[in-house]
Amino acid sequence: MSIYRISTTRKMPEVQKLNALLASYVRFISADSSLRDVLAAKIPAEQERVKNFRKQHGSFKMGETTVDMMYGGMRGIKALVTETSVLDADEGIRFRGLSIPECQKVLPAADGGEEPLPEGLFWLLLTGEVPSKAQVKQVSREWAARAALPQHVVTMLNNFPTSLHPMSQFSAAITALNHDSKFAKAYSDGVHKSKYWEHVYEDSMDLIAKLPVVAATIYCNTYRNGKGSKSIDSSLDWSANFVKMLGYDDPKFTELMRLYLTIHSDHEGGNVSAHTVHLVGSALSDPYLSFAAGMNGLAGPLHGLANQEVLVWLRKLQKEAGSNPSEEQLKEYIWKTLKSGQVVPGYGHAVLRKTDPRYTCQREFALKHLPNDELFQLVSKIYKVVPPILQETGKVKNPWPNVDAHSGVLLQYYGMKEMNYYTVLFGVSRALGVLASLVWDRALGLPIERPKSLSTDLLMKMVQK
């Protein structure tokens, strides 16, 4: 039986009543219920819960905004509602209340596998429930059935020059998929706003199903002279089909892909890609247009290119200090990097203040499957050396490694050497979180986003009062 998880810790009487109401819906949902059925049963009670919460506490002040926050990328401003995940500075990301280690324990794995299936994580993000293995297999089959690309998108992908960046191809193909948007058609036909979520859900399921085919086509066209299978095997899970279409057949790489697609899926709602999807979606752009916009943000070097920068830095380090540098050589190179005005890529995070659990689970995977790999051993040495040096500078709030410090090393080990492609993998994964959030945006009837902006002159006048 599925496990129902409530995402709030508030103990207000009205919330407790609504929780009981929500539980009454859940009691009638069997372990074999479809994802859509489970979600549909939860939405009315959640709508009522949010409605009553806003009615009772709508004027509650969440914090203050400073001038530095406005000029500093809005860091720390509490201004968004995202149900799918919350990032704790000390514990890292929690998906609907579950940490990454907890997800690894309770989410179903493939037969013979150990890592959680992304289908199960999507179920968790969308419903707040841990699904049964049967429910996860149901999602795998449904995504396989929805995966075929329309011919105009296939033609488009095959006509792109191989010199076009993979993320440009990815974004363009996703945009072109909106030709068949069910939400756009329903909106044009005058569907009632209470039904918006249903059509956003359908588009999101279609899009997630098609992304591995789009991404694999880009990979094969750009790096394999078009060679590769684009056929979907309905007996395989989402990740296994993706790996097969990419042209890889190592079961351990498939396990890595399941882990990778799970841990990169969501990271609150304030990062560039997640916020962009929410923002564009708030204008009632369909999921294809909204997600494509988010992918254009992910393509930016400050967001989705970090794991490439880590690998470039590691290769430069090896070139200068050798493939097996001593601790003293590492310290010398790291200080050289810092004194030149650069950062050590893969270290630090805007929110986290401890080692990123996404780094930790990748390290555990490497320790199990590739402990003697030269690049992994170098990353392990750096893990010991960098934090104390960054602490010594006194300028870094978080000296610990983040997810990007490790992911590229694992992909390199299994033969995926094409660094320009890594952000596409990130994008395929990120769809799980941002599209689950987009469904809830429409289910809760969130309005178009329109914050107030001020000029520097006006700010100066305000502080002089």
Swiss-Prot record:
Keywords of the record: Mitochondrion, Transferase, Transit peptide, Tricarboxylic acid cycle
One of the protein's GO biological processes: citrate metabolic process
Compartmental location: Mitochondrion matrix
Entry keyword annotation includes Transit peptide: yes
Primary location class: mitochondrion
The reaction(s) this protein catalyses: oxaloacetate + acetyl-CoA + H2O = citrate + CoA + H(+)
Assigned EC number: 2.3.3.16
Active site: H303, H349, D404
GO cellular component: mitochondrial matrix
Molecular function terms, GO-annotated: citrate (Si)-synthase activity
Pathway where this protein functions: Carbohydrate metabolism; tricarboxylic acid cycle; isocitrate from oxaloacetate: step 1/2
Family: Belongs to the citrate synthase family.
PANTHER family per the UniProt record, alphabetical: CITRATE SYNTHASE (PTHR11739), CITRATE SYNTHASE, MITOCHONDRIAL (PTHR11739:SF8)
Subunit record text: Homodimer.
Further remarks about this protein from its record: Citrate synthase is found in nearly all cells capable of oxidative metabolism.
Protein's recorded name: Probable citrate synthase, mitochondrial
Lineage: Eukaryota, Metazoa, Ecdysozoa, Arthropoda, Hexapoda
